[in-house]
């Protein structure tokens, strides 16, 4: 449930941010309510800077925005990786208990063994029930974050190119 709530929250945040970035793409004035606007503001605030320094400043701006865009993704990835392992741990523990019961009581009652094995496998199923949707949610949310980061990279490259062209013309 935690992974689902985290994914929904990050998806909604990134959808809002993505909408603001899209609006910023259509605007000439930098609006600091979105990552692209904050990066554009760096360009606006430094019109006479040499190209190399501007490129470094813009890259720094993108790097500052990236952690907020990728927030929560590592936790989703960890949950997706650990859930099946926890299920497997439960299965192994259940199988150990089943074999201990066989050692004590013998293998005469297959129903008793089947029940133990069945309950042991339930933990694997539960682990997979957590992991599979979490991997899917991680992929969707990560894709949304990476699209925004790609826009930032693309726009900063364009700003550096325009800045270089303007310097060459003058």
Q: What feature does the model see in each segment?
A:
Residues 1-17:
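Hydrophobic alpha-helical transmembrane segments
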Residues 12-107, 136-170:
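Predominantly long cytosolic amphipathic alpha-helical stalk/bundle segments
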Residues 111-142:
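Pore-lining and gate-forming transmembrane alpha-helices of multi-pass membrane transport proteins
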Residues 4, 40, 87, 117, ...:
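Residue-level signature of catalytic and energy-coupling elements of molecular machines
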